[in-house]
Amino acid sequence: MTEQTATQNYSFQAEVAQLLHLVTHSLYSNPEIFLRELISNASDACDKLRFEGINHPEYYEDDANLRVRVSLDKENKTITISDNGIGLSQQEAIDNLGTIAKSGTKDFMSKLTGDQKSDAQLIGQFGVGFYSGFIVADKITVESRRAGLPANDGVRWISGGTGDFEVQQITKDSRGTSIILHLRDDALDYLDAWKVKQIINKYSDHISLPIEMQKEVWQEEEVAEGEEPKGGQYVKTDEWEVINSASALWTRSKNEISEEQYIEFYKNLTHDFDAPLAWSHNRVEGNTEYTQLLYIPAKASSDIFTREAKAGIKLYVKRVFIMDDADNLIPNYLRFVKGVIDSADLPLNVSRELLQESRDVKTIREGNTRRVLTLLDGLAKSEDEKDQEKFKTFYQEFGSVLKEGLGEDFTNRERILKLLRYATSNQDEISTSFADYKARMKEGQKAIYYVSADSLAAAKNSPQLELFKKKGIEVLLMSERVDEWAMNFVHEFDGTPLQNVSKGAVDLGDLQDAEEKKALEQAAEQFKPVVDKLTDALKDKTKEVRVTTRLVDSPACLVTSDGELSPQLIRMLKQAGQAVPESKPILEINPEHPLVQKLEGSAQFDDLANVIFDQAVIAEGGLPEDPAAYVKRINSLLLK
């Protein structure tokens, strides 16, 4: 590298400047991870060269042995991490090193809390491991040339980790990238070769490429002839030695891999600072042969419910990296799963379009789905306290994502149902499965009852539960946005029908005695004039008014007919910008309630009728159509 052009100065994207400050402070408690991150990036660069080299063998430039090298220079106080991978063009260096190249950057920055552990995890998830070099360096120089470009199209990128960086065009004979860290005075212990080798073996042993360092030999001090040497030192040679095992971890036998190695591979793969909850490593043989190493993270990524959420599966073919985010290999409701799939059958030039049509991919996807559900089922059924805690953590983080599978995966719907957990009218903890509920059903109970609402508190205090509480019948409480949608695809569990207590008529069968049924019939007949008058007064808001079969303490509640969308689902669809068919709820009134009894003969019948309706709307989590009119009616009634 000799010639260079004039220096051009650029400013960092505002979020990057903030991030650089954060990196040097929040991550300082675990500084050695900088080496893991930079070696991982170097390995990725070599993977990308392998992939592009399939169609462009000239990119190898007579240097086909891919590797990563770590060099220590005590005199200049630098560590250099270099690779002979794909390299960067000048524009790529400006774009990739000066911005966070990911949508949702502002959302990312808003989630930073100042807490070292949680912020470190966020930083890793957003793929900005390069900046971890500033944990130990007060200046970073990057020298690179992209494969396929001429030698004089190299680039040098320099930054002191503040608000700007400079870029120069240089001549670089070899392709690839060298990252030169100019160490701060408090980080000079990373110039110790033995320490660096330990860090490489700890974090990066599984990297499939050789990671090399200059070999050192012991050289005794020179002494006069006949005298015994009293000391010596290690000196570097021109020979490079491989520090790591240099074999892809997933290709090894499970018996040869320690738990710590599995965890470090996961952290390197995902840039997650937390250990995974569980993993499954298998070689699948048959018509379609592949190796799968799948992980369940301990924490959901910040974008899991956004359109930007990507599947965390890397696809390899015969150990050649093909693509990140291979979403065809895992169903969308398992998008939280991270890992590696290495296929023996797919072509090396496979495209995302081909993945959609491939029979082998369909087989791999089905196999991955079964394996993940089996892994989760094992945690759920385990009597080991640690496994139980892992499943509880999993469900807190990913339960709502898993529920999407009820509508997406008919084949595995029963398996998914068995993994779901809910609070109930008898217990607040979200720990009751459908099987648990069924085992606790009252004698004579014919259905599994549930109620859905916008929050756990709203579900627990739903007016529709009053009769069930009076009868001592347990009801499942569903309080997540996805619940109402998901339950549209489920009609029974293990032969027992599911019944939404806010839909249709309530029939408790043998749990409701003949006298109660007779009393309800008499009340309906007695209040028919009031019901007719209410029907007329609320004709624009309700499709029907009827005497309730489910209320005890509340004056009224809203219900929907079987097969119709609930108010919660209507609100959710509208918030998502989807068209919703017009529908009106059914208003059920409680003839035993004083407010309802006051309707008969009231001079303010219409006002009272509308207040009762609006209160029913509020009770199920909605808002009155005209809040101002509601307040006006309340005030008018209070003054009487």
Swiss-Prot record:
Residues 353-571 are annotated as: B. It holds the Pfam family HATPase_c_3. Residues 572-640 are annotated as: C. GO terms for cellular component: cytoplasm. The keyword Nucleotide-binding applies. One of its GO terms (molecular function) is ATP-dependent protein folding chaperone. Residues 1-352 are annotated as: A. Transmembrane segments: none annotated. Gene3D superfamilies: 3.30.230.80, 3.40.50.11260, Heat shock protein 90, C-terminal domain (1.20.120.790), Histidine kinase-like ATPase, C-terminal domain (3.30.565.10). The keyword Glycoprotein does not apply. Keywords: ATP-binding, Chaperone, Cytoplasm, Nucleotide-binding, Stress response. It is found in: Cytoplasm. It comes from the Bacteria. SMART domains: HATPase_c. Homodimer. Molecular chaperone. Has ATPase activity. Belongs to the heat shock protein 90 family. NCBIfam families: PRK05218.1. This is Chaperone protein HtpG. It comes from Acinetobacter baylyi (strain ATCC 33305 / BD413 / ADP1). The lineage of its organism: Bacteria, Pseudomonadati, Pseudomonadota, Gammaproteobacteria, Moraxellales.
